[in-house]
Amino acid sequence: MSHLFSPPLAALAASPLLYVYSPERPGLPLAFAPAAALAGPGRVEPPQKPPYSYIALIAMAIQDAPEQRVTLNGIYQFIMDRFPFYHDNRQGWQNSIRHNLSLNECFVKVPREKGRPGKGSYWTLDPRCLDMFENGNYRRRKRKPKPAAGSPEAKRTRVEPPESEVGCDVGSPDLATALPTRAPDRSQSPAVGTARPALLPWPGPEPRDPDADLTVQGAGAVASGQLQRPAHHLGSPLCPAPSGSPKGSKSKSFSIDSILAVRPTPASGAEAPGIPKPVPGALGSSLLAASSGLAPPFNASLVFDAHVQGGFSQLGIPFLSYFPLQVPEATVLRFH
């Protein structure tokens, strides 16, 4: 701008001022003012975070102290004086400073001497870590060289097993006697306190007592003579009819087996030989046949009453009412 303006204007152009130009007069400035005045107090940018780690900040504070040692409050004060960014949010970064002091081996805690004013211990740098930064540059730390395999430092840095693993070492003489030589095989021996489920036997049909068989008295039962044997009722097995059993026995007292063993005689040749013929005046033989092959709770005894023709009474457990009966209309049932 020196070739356009006079020397006083050239000096103004070199100064840190802001110039305001008009669109009507593009070559001439209308006004000028300092940049800080135009920016105003509300537009001041906040301070930037310094590009240093917390370890570098602590090392700066220690090396800046006259005796190369400083208290914790001295470290806080040094950081806030040098870096305005740490004026705010003190609790956050101060906690980080304390953690780095306690976790890093390069910082050594020195107790305060007796009689020295003040409180708190001092912090200093380990003599082996004085040159941990490259050429005094606090932005870059030197990498620690790996110790040799046989050096004492490598033995010190070796990770020792935890106490739980050391305590469980079987090679020790005390634990070798305490531990069993071999664990029991679960597949061969059952576990203690466990029992196999016991199999409950299902009650089968008990043998019939001949004394508990049904006895029939009366002329009606003898006259009918022929009772049918059920072909397919409840799937109960029936004993085959004996060959020497009489067909028309007129005895007043006989067993139920002789009644069940009697086969009906076909009335005509047109009827099938295997199909039984129903008898109107007969008692439901299906009930009697089924009761002989069922479990013991279903066994019962029926006795005809001699005083009442066609009537009978029950002995034993209650008579099951859902069994089909074929009883003539004149028959009277009486239950006790």
From Swiss-Prot:
Question: Could you mention a single GO BP entry for this protein?
Answer: visceral mesoderm-endoderm interaction involved in midgut development
Concerning Pfam families, the annotation shows:
Forkhead (PF00250)
Q: What happens when the gene is disrupted?
A: Deficient mice show postnatal growth retardation secondary to severe structural abnormalities of the stomach, duodenum, jejunum and decreased intestinal uptake of D-glucose and levels of the intestinal D-glucose transporter Slc5a1.
Task: Return the SMART domains for the record.
Answer: FH
Task: Give the UniProt subcellular location, in the record's own words.
Answer: Nucleus
Q: Name one GO cellular component term.
A: nucleus
**Which CDD domains does the protein's record reference?**
FH_FOXL1
**Which GO terms of the molecular function aspect are on file?**
DNA binding; DNA-binding transcription factor activity; sequence-specific DNA binding
Q: Which residues bind DNA?
A: 48-139
Ranges of compositional bias, category Low complexity = 242-252
Q: Where is this protein primarily located?
A: nucleus
- Renumbered to this chain, region (Disordered) spans 140-214, 227-252
What keywords does the record list, in alphabetical order? DNA-binding, Nucleus, Transcription, Transcription regulation
Give a short account of what the protein does.
Transcription factor required for proper proliferation and differentiation in the gastrointestinal epithelium. Target gene of the hedgehog (Hh) signaling pathway via GLI2 and GLI3 transcription factors.
PANTHER family xrefs: FORKHEAD BOX PROTEIN (PTHR11829), FORKHEAD BOX PROTEIN L1 (PTHR11829:SF204)
Mind telling me what this protein is named? Forkhead box protein L1
Q: What organism is this sequence from?
A: Mus musculus (Mouse)
Q: What is the lineage of its organism?
A: Eukaryota, Metazoa, Chordata, Craniata, Vertebrata
